[in-house]
Amino acid sequence: MTHTEALFKTIILLHHLAELHKKDNVDLYYIDLFCGAGGTSTGVEQANIGSGSIAKVIACVNHDKNAIASHMANHPYALHFTEDMRTLDLAPIVNLIKKIKFRNPNARFVLWASLECTNFSKAKGGQARDPDSRTLADHLFRYIEEINPDLIQIENVEEFMCWGDLDENGKPISKDKGRLYLRWIERVQYGYLPCRGYQQERHDELFDTFRRGNLLDKVYDFDHRILNAADFGAYTSRKRFFGQFAKKDMPIVWPEPTHCKDGEQTLF
């Protein structure tokens, strides 16, 4: 992660967490997936009102031992897992959440996922995509089921919204552009967990059946933005997709830009 990316995430997080805390005086606890060296976690822990911290990172996951070592040096009190998020045993995180809830009834838990973006990004050009990498978002359902977060925050390249099927050569099928993205968003909103052992087609069929029969209630509200780092004071133009899923008692808020390209807009 570059300094610019870390700064960008920090600005967004500081604004968002302050708004959440002011609304209900809640304390926010983060589980940081794909945590890297800790840019997002730093943004979380710099959020404060006055001199009081309002958010804390309690668990971090990354497969790279060097990234985890750096993260641990800066955030020594969090649980650290040098593991593949697809196979991580979630029991230690779930047990920690239970302890925090017992001590702090105002605790709210946030699942942050900066999903691997290489196989969505347009920077990859016409090269084949890795289908396993593109399905990492599906592995979040296990975390949603066991952790039951109050808020889920996703960060990725803007092409994440184009997530669709691949052909036999691993190339995106243009007519299916965005199909899997939209279906994934719906599943998260309705808390629909893919049934283990079923093929994708069966998942789709079951989900549609449950929706038509009004057998599913919406668990999360959803909103997203494409935000540009340059609009928040960074020295480069870098667009990113940010998505938020919030339970009914949690607000979804977004920061207002602090800078503009033409220099003529006013902040007041």
What are these regions (language model features)?
Residues 1-56, 61-103:
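S-adenosyl-L-methionine
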Residues 27, 56-57, 106-108, 149:
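Local beta-strand N-terminus motif with an aromatic residue
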Residues 39, 67, 89, 117-119, ...:
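Feature marks short, surface-exposed loop/turn motifs that line or immediately flank catalytic pockets
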Residues 56-59, 78-81, 221-223:
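Conserved beta-strand segments of alpha/beta enzyme cores
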Residues 59-65, 84, 155-159:
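Conserved acidic E/D residue at the C-terminus of a beta-strand in Rossmann-like folds
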Residues 96-105, 117-268:
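Class I S-adenosyl-L-methionine
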Residues 110-112, 153:
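N-terminal Rossmann-like NAD(P) cofactor-binding module of classical short-chain dehydrogenase/reductase
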